A protein has these predicted regions:
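Active-site-adjacent structural elements in enzyme catalytic cores
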Residues: 22-284
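Short basic, glycine-rich beta-strand/loop surfaces that mediate nucleic-acid
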Residues: 1-2, 221
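Conserved short beta-strand edge segments in small beta-sheet-based binding/regulatory domains
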Residues: 2-22
Length: 284
């Protein structure tokens, strides 16, 4: 669980009978010790729902709950309430509102809670024109990657440039666009095959595997294997390559549908800030 009580003051109350528990609206009229929550990688419960055809959030790329999902990235003002986030314009449908209001539900007061009916939708654009949405958008993205295109994917915190790691020519085009001719790139691998694709490319110790699966979804340096399965041009002359697992439900779906490793690097020219706005990516 990511929820931990932080009690700054307590006071015993004698003769008081408590009948229920409520989360009241935040007060903004007085200063207080406010903590900004970080973004969290998608949890196992949400991954299970994401892959369950019987679940109403099946393959919904923005699934989240109180244990996972974006926080810091969504905040426009404090305190951290839905009305102060970029989710404010998405009115909850009756089913999501019921979950949000139910203290026994793991989405109780999960501020970014949403579903395919009431939440953000997935779009695929080319040259500033929307080509497809939702499942068709995901399929179009996978097709573009398989055809050797470099794709900008909007994740939590900003855009990634992604391409087929097994296509050296495409990797070089990505390097040229990013103006990063030699520095190592990182690879993102699917989870659906039990890390089989990962084990074909690198050798991982038990400790490195554990680090890879930790909540931070960090990049782990691993020893490259020799042979035909080794991607070319990823970390020239290093003998090691940075590997990571999908951290968001969108990346989870994309990597699983693609079925192999993708180069994943921030969508900015080396040394410049990460791109977060759609218009900035379209102009770059």
């Amino acid at each position: 669980a990511i929820a931990h009580p932080l009690i700054s003051h307590s006071e015993p109350l004698d003769g008081v009978t408590l009948k229920d528990f409520r989360i009241l609206a935040s007060e903004t009229t007085q200063a207080s010790d406010i903590h900004v929550p970080p973004d969290y990688f998608v949890c196992e419960d949400c991954l299970t729902e994401l892959d369950d055809p019987q679940n109403r959030r099946y393959r919904y790329p923005f699934i989240n709950c109180t244990q996972c999902g974006p926080r810091y990235t969504l905040i426009e003002a404090l305190p951290y309430d839905r009305a102060n986030t970029s989710m404010a314009s998405f009115e909850l449908c009756p089913e999501c509102l019921k979950e949000y209001s139910d203290i026994s539900n793991r989405r109780f007061h999960a501020e970014p809670v949403a579903c395919g009916r009431c939440g953000p939708q997935l779009l695929f654009s080319q040259a500033g024109h929307e080509i497809a949405d939702n499942e068709a958008a995901l399929a179009a993205c996978v097709t573009a990657l398989r055809e050797g295109q470099v794709v900008a994917v909007k994740g939590v915190g900003g855009y990634h440039l992604m391409c087929n790691a097994a296509d050296p020519a495409t990797v070089q085009r990505l390097r040229a666009h990013k103006r990063r001719p030699h520095k190592p790139l990182a690879l993102m691998f699917p989870l659906s095959d039990g890390l089989a694709a990962l084990s074909r490319v690198v050798t991982l110790s038990a400790e490195e595997t554990a680090l890879l699966r930790k909540p931070g979804r960090r990049i782990v340096m691993a020893t490259e294997k020799s042979g035909n399965g080794r991607p070319q041009g990823i970390s020239p002359g290093q003998g090691e390559v940075g590997v990571m697992l999908p951290y968001s439900p969108l990346h989870h779906l994309l990597l699983n549908d693609f079925g192999g490793p993708l180069v994943a690097t921030s969508a900015n020219i080396s040394g410049e800030p990460v791109l977060t706005e759609n218009t900035s990516v379209e102009q770059s």
